[in-house]
Amino acid sequence: MSLDQYLPIFLFILVGIGVGVAPQVLGYILGPNLPDSAKNSPYECGFEAFGDARMKFDVRYYLVAILFILFDLEIAFLFPWAVALKDIGALGFWSVMVFLTILVVGFIYEWKKGALDWE
């Protein structure tokens, strides 16, 4: 497999980065920069902020978000495995079973530790 086959992928990545970065750079360069106290103050639905604009969230929100990302990533790994199951054979099957076992053991550990309880 030669590197010429990766050229379209490389160009796709470059165009994607360019589409994301170019408007931000152009806005920064061409946009007016006129700061004043009204623009720099926190704003909530037409009222001045009632409390601290940077309130702390409970750690459980972050834990649930990390668990969601972990198991969402697991599904992202399982889709290509399911498509190529005929081609990868028994070794591929059992390696994914080990992967799933590790994830299930981790999930049971978190459940037993009470990480998923909202008391």
Swiss-Prot record:
It comes from the Bacteria. It is a multi-pass membrane protein. The keyword Cell membrane applies. The chain crosses the membrane at residues 9-29, 63-83, 88-108. It catalyses: a quinone + NADH + 5 H(+)(in) = a quinol + NAD(+) + 4 H(+)(out). Keywords: Cell inner membrane, Cell membrane, Membrane, NAD, Quinone, Translocase, Transmembrane, Transmembrane helix, Transport, Ubiquinone. Pfam families: Oxidored_q4. NDH-1 shuttles electrons from NADH, via FMN and iron-sulfur (Fe-S) centers, to quinones in the respiratory chain. The immediate electron acceptor for the enzyme in this species is believed to be ubiquinone. Couples the redox reaction to proton translocation (for every two electrons transferred, four hydrogen ions are translocated across the cytoplasmic membrane), and thus conserves the redox energy in a proton gradient. This is NADH-quinone oxidoreductase subunit A. It comes from Albidiferax ferrireducens (strain ATCC BAA-621 / DSM 15236 / T118). The lineage of its organism: Bacteria, Pseudomonadati, Pseudomonadota, Betaproteobacteria, Burkholderiales.
